[in-house]
């Protein structure tokens, strides 16, 4: 038996560390009375939605203005005194105390990066205090579903210095019998793709998320991915499909979308996406239209919502208010879940719950500025989300999440269920 006093928060410390892009980020450690502790590091995005929670940066010359000493100080000087003495088991109370202390709508007082670091570290400390893995602590005995990975193997847009407008072209190995086999399938296609790009004289340098960043058009990227799937010995659309992150807010201005040398209004943009769905085995499209183009999104949902998964990232920013607006207007059918968009674990879980109750899927996601923290791997299993998006098959901050999912699958043994094997995850009309 555990002593409840052992699970009381005793000390909280924080430090400035680096993310995968060499930018500062916040790490927090929560230590409990009984000696257990938890550590977490927050990620950071490149293409950020205008409605995301506020990430506090120092400004000035240090680290080119990207330092996070203010956020670190807020943890140690303001958050720690407010939380010490609370039970780490009451995650909702811990997060509520920080939100009350912050007092703003977008966490701009303390910084979402300060609040989230403590929120995630607290959950891990509580799990460690109970002797439970994080996925089991958060998800209970039903946390046995391993997610279908959406593997970003070709990077463009804000994630790479190339000519590709769309931000991510992903492999979706939904036809695998297990997560381990899905990872193998994706990895084999990744290496096959590298050989194809090299043979065509294209760059095999990788972008922020570990995918290749060749100079291609959007159609060419789809064509070479299908070729790589086939050459690796798999059937496009049956075993491995494609997913896109258009990140269209990045090339939207004055009511028009400018990409691949053309300029399109919302209806024309929807038409362009329809053509791609007809041409390729695409099962999921993220941010197909800009974050505040609600009318365009409604049209996209009417035209493609019954055929493919339409994921709102910048549209919803893991925010229940914006998600409810989408639900009420039948806009999109899926939400991308990024813990640092909303800034606390409790609010993240609330967004996933609202999505599930409303018939929307959830895709647990990393950010382009990642770290070795593997919380989102456990979160994907804990919430039975059935999908995870955590980059390519290179760069250790991406692979860390895949390796954690392998460990979880092994630990679950015969209880483990791969979402793709039971018809969950994106399947589209492939």
Curated annotation (Swiss-Prot):
EC number: 4.2.1.11
Major location category of this protein: cytoplasm
Localization annotation: Cytoplasm; Secreted; Cell surface
Keyword terms: Cytoplasm, Glycolysis, Lyase, Magnesium, Metal-binding, Secreted
Biological or metabolic pathway of the protein: Carbohydrate degradation; glycolysis; pyruvate from D-glyceraldehyde 3-phosphate: step 4/5
Family stated for the protein in its record: Belongs to the enolase family.
Task performed by this protein: Catalyzes the reversible conversion of 2-phosphoglycerate (2-PG) into phosphoenolpyruvate (PEP). It is essential for the degradation of carbohydrates via glycolysis.
Protein name: Enolase
Organism of this sequence: Synechococcus sp. (strain WH7803)
């Amino acid at each position: 038996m555990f002593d409840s006093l052992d699970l009381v928060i005793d000390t909280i410390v924080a430090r400035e560390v680096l993310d995968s892009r060499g930018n500062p980020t916040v790490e927090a450690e929560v230590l409990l009375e009984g000696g257990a502790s938890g550590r977490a590091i927050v990620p950071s995005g490149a293409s950020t939605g205008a409605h995301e929670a506020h990430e506090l940066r120092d400004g000035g010359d240090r680290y080119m203005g990207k330092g996070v000493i203010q956020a670190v100080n807020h943890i140690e000087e303001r958050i720690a005194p407010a939380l010490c003495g609370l039970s780490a088991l009451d995650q909702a109370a811990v997060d509520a105390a920080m939100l009350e202390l912050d007092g703003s709508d977008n966490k701009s007082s303390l910084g979402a990066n300060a609040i989230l670091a403590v929120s995630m570290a607290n959950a891990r400390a509580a799990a460690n205090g109970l002797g439970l893995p994080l996925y089991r602590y958060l998800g209970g005995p039903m946390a046995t579903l391993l997610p279908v990975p959406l593997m970003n193997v070709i990077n463009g847009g804000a994630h790479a210095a190339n000519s590709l407008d769309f931000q991510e072209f992903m492999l979706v190995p939904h036809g695998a019998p297990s997560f381990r086999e899905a990872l193998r399938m994706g990895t084999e296609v990744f290496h096959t793709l590298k050989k194809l790009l090299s043979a065509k004289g294209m760059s095999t340098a990788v972008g922020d998320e570990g995918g290749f960043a060749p100079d291609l058009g959007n159609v060419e990227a789809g064509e070479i991915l299908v070729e790589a799937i086939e050459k690796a010995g798999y059937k496009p659309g049956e075993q491995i499909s494609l997913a896109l992150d258009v990140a269209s807010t990045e090339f939207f201005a004055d009511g028009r979308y400018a990409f691949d040398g053309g300029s399109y209004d919302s209806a024309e943009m929807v038409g362009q996406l329809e053509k791609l769905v007809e041409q390729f085995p695409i099962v999921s499209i993220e941010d197909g239209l800009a974050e505040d183009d609600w009318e365009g999104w409604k049209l996209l949902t009417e035209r493609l919502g019954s055929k493919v998964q339409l994921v709102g990232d910048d549209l919803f920013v893991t925010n229940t208010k914006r998600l409810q607006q989408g639900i009420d207007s039948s806009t999109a059918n899926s939400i991308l879940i990024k813990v640092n968009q909303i800034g606390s674990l409790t609010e993240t879980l609330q967004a996933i719950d609202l999505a599930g109750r409303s018939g929307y899927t959830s895709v647990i996601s990393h950010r382009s500025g990642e770290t070795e923290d593997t919380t989102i791997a456990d979160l994907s299993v804990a919430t039975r989300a059935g999908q995870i998006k955590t980059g390519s098959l290179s760069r250790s901050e991406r692979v860390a999440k895949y390796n954690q999912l392998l460990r979880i699958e092994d630990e679950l043994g015969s209880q483990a269920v791969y979402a793709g094997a039971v018809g969950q995850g994106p399947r589209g009309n492939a």
